[in-house]
UniProtKB/Swiss-Prot annotation:
GO terms of biological process kind: DNA-templated transcription
Listed GO MF terms: DNA binding; DNA-directed RNA polymerase activity
Organism, as annotated: Rhizobium meliloti (strain 1021) (Ensifer meliloti)
Descriptive protein name: DNA-directed RNA polymerase subunit omega
Enzyme Commission number: 2.7.7.6
Gene3D superfamilies according to UniProt: 3.90.940.10
Alphabetized Pfam families for the sequence: RNA_pol_Rpb6 (PF01192)
Class of enzymatic activity (EC top level): transferase
Recorded name of the encoding gene: rpoZ
PANTHER family (UniProt xref): DNA-DIRECTED RNA POLYMERASE SUBUNIT OMEGA
Xref: InterPro entries: DNA-dir_RNA_pol_omega (IPR003716), Pol_omega/Rpo6/RPB6 (IPR006110), RPB6/omega-like_sf (IPR036161)
Family: Belongs to the RNA polymerase subunit omega family.
Protein function: Promotes RNA polymerase assembly. Latches the N- and C-terminal regions of the beta' subunit thereby facilitating its interaction with the beta and alpha subunits.
Keywords in alphabetical order: DNA-directed RNA polymerase, Nucleotidyltransferase, Transcription, Transferase
Amino acid sequence: MARVTVEDCIDKVENRFELVLLASHRARLVSQGAPITVDRDNDKNPVVALREIADETLSPGDLKEDLIHSLQKHVEVDEPEPDPASLVQTEAAPAFAEAAEEEDQPEALTFDRMSEEELLAGIEGLVPPEKSDDY
C-alpha cells in the first residue's frame, strides 16, 4: 500500500488500529460487491478502501457503525416507552388475574417416570444419523 494513502487517512481517523479495522471492513464490502466511490485505477480493494477514507467519500463514523453492526451477534432493538396510562392498568391487572386464576385452574401436568435402565435401553436403541458431507 502506498504510504501516502495511509498518511492521508491518519488525518481522518486518528487511531491507526481503527483505520486498519475500517479499511479492512470496507475492502471486504467492496469484494462482496459494494459500489466503489472513487476511481479504481487498477488498485486492489484495500487501497481503494483507504483512498475512499482519505478522500472522505465515506464517513469514518458511518463505516465504524457499519463495522460494529456487522460484528454484533445479538442486535438490541429500542422499544418505545410504555405510556403511564397502560402502567396503571397493568398495576390493577394482578388483582383481576388472581380472581380469574382461582376460577380457571387447569389440571396439573404429569410427566412419565423412567428408570435409569429404561433410559439406557432407549439410548442404546437409537440409530446413529447417516453421515453427510457437511462436515
